[in-house]
Amino acid sequence: MNQMKIAVAGASGRMGHMLIEAILNAADATLSGALDIATSPAIGTDAAAFLGKPSGVLIESDLAKGLANADFLIDFTRPEGTLKHLEYCAAHGIKMIIGTTGFDVAGKAAIAAAAEKTAIMFAPNMSVGVNVTMKLLEMAAQNFSEGYDIEIIEAHHRNKVDAPSGTAIKMGEVIAGALGKELNDVAVWAREGVTGARDPSSIGFATVRGGDIIGDHTVLFAGDGERIEISHKSSSRVSYAHGSLRAARFLADKKTGLYDMQDVLGLR
């Protein structure tokens, strides 16, 4: 069995820990590197020290050292960090699984350009359940296109820095696409004061931040006499880690190209 040699960015964070544990427990994967910011107190420590069973892989801030033995980099960090990693990986043929959210238009364009040099999986949510939910939303939108108001409500922990979540935005894009629209043309990102009657063609967003909520998303289709709610709730980040490994397996035979979890799951 060929071993996937995988490095993890943000190795000392909560998601980094979950990814490292999943890689160490996978029969077809090897932890080959670990990265974190230069100011992290974890630099120079064993990447699996939190598990009480050292891996022999030290957390590095230098990309050349941290990625020296890697064929893949899984990155759930922040846009500015991911874009630095992206440049290095594209130049060295290292495949990337990007779960970072909050990219602007230029950042997304940089990812697309890098995909001409290496294979990239870019998805706002690696959970299999979330991505099946996306397909359900596409089907629902096609059937609730007239007479139903669409609202997307998402909740995350107090430390999440971007809003709405990347997953909520992707849900909006899927719904808008199913209706033959562009999300930016119909999205209402917030409401305050005297807003007037609701535009029936709009897609509304509401954001909640608090506690340790990992990620809850509900899409409401509200019609006359009935409401349909399609929800996904994350109880552990382990689903993101398992989805990331599934994404790496999908990329294993790809040289270049930009993919998302819909490709992995055959939901196109």
UniProtKB/Swiss-Prot annotation:
NAD(+) binds at G10, A11, S12, G13, R14, M15, D36, G99, T100, T101, A123, P124, N125, M126. Pathway: Amino-acid biosynthesis; L-lysine biosynthesis via DAP pathway; (S)-tetrahydrodipicolinate from L-aspartate: step 4/4. GO terms for cellular component: cytosol. InterPro entries: DapB_C, DapB_N, DapB_N_CS, DHDPR_bac, NAD(P)-bd_dom_sf. It comes from the Bacteria. (S)-2,3,4,5-tetrahydrodipicolinate binds at H157, G166, T167. Its EC number is 1.17.1.8. GO terms for molecular function: 4-hydroxy-tetrahydrodipicolinate reductase; NAD binding; NADP binding; oxidoreductase activity, acting on CH or CH2 groups, NAD or NADP as acceptor. Belongs to the DapB family. This is 4-hydroxy-tetrahydrodipicolinate reductase. It comes from Herminiimonas arsenicoxydans. The lineage of its organism: Bacteria, Pseudomonadati, Pseudomonadota, Betaproteobacteria, Burkholderiales.
